[in-house]
Each structure stands twice: as C-alpha cells, then as structure tokens.
C-alpha cells in the first residue's frame, strides 16, 4: 500500500512539473508574440516615472486629459495608415487630405468668411473629398502599378492644392458655432469627446483587422502578394479599399483638427505624417508589410505624444525639444523594431 501511495505521489509530482513547464512555455510564448506591445507599455511606464519625477504636474488628471486631447487626431489617422503599411505600401497624402477636407468642412459650416452653412451636409462633402483622394491614390497604385510612395506624394500635393484654392489668400475662416467649437474639449465620463471619437475609430479598425476578410487579406498581401492572389484574395480591390479608408480617416482627422483649432488652415495636418508613420513602426508594424496591427500603432501614437508632452513639462528649451525628441525617438524605434530588422524594407 505504501508503494502505491508513493507511486501516486510521483505521478502527481510529474504532472505538476509538466503543468508548470507548460505554464512557463505559455508565458514565454505570450511574451515572444507580444514583444512589441509589451516594449511599448514598458517604455511608457519608464517615461511616466521620469517625467513624473521631473514635474509632478505630468501625472495630474488635467494633464492626462490634455494628452488624450492631443492624441485624438493622430489616433484616427494611424488606423488608416496601418492598414496601408500592413500590405507593404505607404500613404504620404495625409497632410494634403487633412487640409482639403478641413477647409471644405469649415467653409460649408458656420464661419466668419462665407455665408455658406449647409449644416450636417458639410460632413459628407468633406469626408467625400478624403475618400476621393484616397480612391485616386489606390486606383493609380493598384491599377496603374505606380509605386505607393510616388503616387501618394502626388496626391498629397493634390490635396494641398485644393486646400490652398479654398483658402484663396483670404482671411482664415473661423468657426462661429461656439457649441461645436467646444465639443472636442468637453468631457464625457471624465475624458475629452475628441478622444472618445478616436477610440471608437481605433476599435472599428481593430474589429476590421481581426474579424473581416479585408483585414486578414491586407496582412496576406503584405506577407506574399503572389500567394495571396493565387489564394483567391481580390488583391487589387483590397489595395484600393485600404487607401480609400486611409483617405476618409485623414479627412475625418482634418475636420476634427479644424474644430479643435477653431479655424480652417491649409496646413492643418502639418507634422502629422511624422507622428503616425514612426508610431506604426514603433508599434511593430513592419514597413515591408505582413505584420503589425491597429492597436499596436495606437500604442505607438500614445508613446510619442506622451514623450512630447513630457519634454514640454520638463522645461526642455523649445530650441532643443526637436533634437531631444528626435534622439529619443530614434533610440525607441531601434529598441522596439530591432528584433524585426530583417523585415524593415522600403515600402512598395
């Protein structure tokens, strides 16, 4: 009987060791497959500690709300940007689309320059401009096989030209609807309305990426376009759709940025491109395609905005902020993207 008890004890020990080993393996697998997001979260935690030490205001509720307000526009843009990058392409038209859509929207809304308010119809018109530029980019890229870098650079200037034409060297139009102008900064459940809008767009992007044929198809195209095409994936249609979505979201971002500013400007999207693309790369979205995700890119946006906000509150001289931001950005990109260096190739 003692032998039987001893045998059962040994079996239980072996079972426990197997379970412990399996548990350890699953933890290692989780860390390996989520290396980029975990690196981002760790980096943000380090930044919070450093900037919180340098300036206690950094960790205040008011500053948190300010950060969430600041990330709203790039969060919307990065959803479309990520979809394009996932298939191994690039979209540089962001600033032009934002300028065109933003100027169109404010000139068709209550403003100080024109008596041309068409109410809610200003939204579909402005979004339609973004969609149109996105479709133009997508068709030229997918149908005519013009490299995405070249064609989106061209449509950037198309959008910028539309914005400048609407501006017309006149006074910048100012939004006269005060309730609408205050909407982005108003709080719902303690958070800015603009952030809730951006969060809804990010959630939609995540759902599309994980639960639709389009989302899975874009990753397949980025991994191997020939195999994707031979597997029955409508590559051309998906490419056009990705740029159309990116254009529409850039248009929405242009409208939101215009409301936040309270006036229209052809340069409303200035600098956004140099936030969203590094954010996507930091988040683990490979420029060669086939890897990454919307949520990862969103974390990348948060990291960059937190970094910029922290530098301001830390009292870094404005003349040196760009240099410091750029240096830290390079270090962060290298730290996060180095494990994927074999996939960081020039976009098609």
For every predicted segment, state its role.
Residues 84-136:
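Membrane-embedded helix boundary and interhelical linker motif in transport proteins
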Residues 118-126, 133-137, 189-264:
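Helix-loop-helix "hairpin" substructures at the membrane interface of multi-pass membrane proteins
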Residues 144, 148-212, 238-241, 260-269, ...:
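Transmembrane helix-bundle core of multi-pass membrane transporters
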Residues 70-81, 100, 132, 154-157, ...:
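Hydrophobic alpha-helical segments embedded in the membrane of multi-pass proteins
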């Amino acid at each position: 009987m003692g032998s039987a008890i001893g045998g059962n004890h040994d079996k239980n020990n072996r079972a426990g060791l197997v379970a412990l080993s399996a548990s350890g393996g699953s933890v290692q697998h989780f860390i390996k497959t989520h290396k980029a997001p975990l690196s981002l979260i760790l980096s943000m935690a380090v930044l919070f500690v450093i900037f919180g030490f340098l300036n206690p205001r950094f960790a205040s509720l008011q500053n948190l709300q300010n950060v969430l307000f600041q990330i709203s526009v790039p969060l919307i843009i990065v959803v479309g940007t990520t979809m394009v990058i996932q298939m191994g392409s690039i979209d540089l038209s962001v600033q032009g689309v934002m300028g065109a859509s933003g100027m169109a929207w404010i000139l068709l809304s209550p403003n100080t320059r024109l008596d041309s308010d068409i109410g809610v119809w200003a939204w579909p018109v402005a979004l339609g401009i973004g969609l149109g530029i996105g479709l133009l980019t997508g068709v030229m890229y997918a149908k005519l096989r013009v490299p995405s870098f070249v064609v989106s650079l061209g449509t950037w200037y198309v959008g910028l030209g539309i914005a400048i034409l609407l501006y017309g060297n006149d006074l910048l139009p100012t939004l006269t609807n005060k309730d609408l102008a205050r909407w982005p900064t108003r709080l719902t459940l303690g958070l800015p309305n603009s952030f809730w809008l951006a969060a809804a767009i990010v959630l939609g992007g995540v759902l599309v990426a994980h639960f639709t044929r389009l989302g899975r198809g874009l990753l397949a195209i980025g991994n191997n376009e020939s195999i994707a095409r031979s597997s029955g994936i409508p590559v051309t249609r998906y490419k056009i759709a990705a740029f159309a979505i990116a254009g529409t979201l850039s248009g929405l971002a242009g409208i939101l940025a215009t409301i936040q500013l309270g006036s229209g400007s052809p340069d409303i999207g200035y600098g956004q491109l140099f936030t969203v693309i590094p954010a996507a790369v930091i988040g683990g979205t490979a420029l060669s395609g086939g890897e990454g995700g919307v949520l990862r890119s969103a974390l990348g946006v948060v990291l960059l905005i937190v970094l910029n906000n922290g530098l301001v509150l830390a009292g870094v001289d404005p003349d040196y902020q760009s240099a410091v931001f750029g240096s830290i950005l390079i270090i962060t990109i290298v730290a996060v993207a180095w494990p994927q260096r074999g996939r960081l190739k020039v976009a098609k």
